C-alpha cells in the first residue's frame, strides 16, 4: 500500500473563448484556466497523486506540455491513461481525495458530477471538496485556481509486474523454514 500527494495550479487564461473545466465538468460562463491541455487543475492533481503513489513519472513527463499531441486534451482522458499506466505497473487505485482552492465558482452544485466523472475514470472512489481563500493571496485576487490531492494505491496481487518481488519473497520464506 502506498500514498501519493500532489499539487497543481493554473492561472486564469486571457483567452475569452476558453472554458473553465474542473474535475471533468465545464463551468460555462466562467473564465477558463491557461494551460496546454484543458487546464483542469482538479484532474491534474488526481493524476499526479496516483502517479506519485505508484512511483511513476509525473504528469509533466507523461503528458509533456511541449508535445502537440496533448494540446487541448481532455484531462479525464489523460487520467484514464495514467490509471492504465498505474495498472500496467502492478498497482490498483484505492481512492483519491482532492481539495480545490478558489473563491469562484462554488463547487458544491457540481461536486457530485465531478466525483462521478473522476471516480469512473479512476475505477475507485474520488472525493472533491472546495476551499475558499477568504481573499488572501494570488488565488484570493482571482489570479488562478489550485488543487491538492492524495491517492492510495495497492499492489495488484495478480499482476506480473511484481513477479520478481514474489519470487524473492518466496526464496526468503524458504530460508526461514
Where are the predicted features?
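Short amphipathic
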Residues: 2-8
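Active-site His/Glu-centered metal-binding helix of metallohydrolases
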Residues: 42, 46, 50
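Polyampholytic, low-complexity intrinsically disordered segments
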Residues: 10, 15, 19-28
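Short, conserved loop-to-beta-strand elements that form functional interface hotspots
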Residues: 95-140
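Glycine- and Gly-Pro-enriched alpha-helical subdomains that act as flexible
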Residues: 49-92, 103
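A short glycine/serine-rich beta->alpha loop
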Residues: 27-37, 65-70, 135-139
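C-terminal edge-of-domain segments
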Residues: 140-159
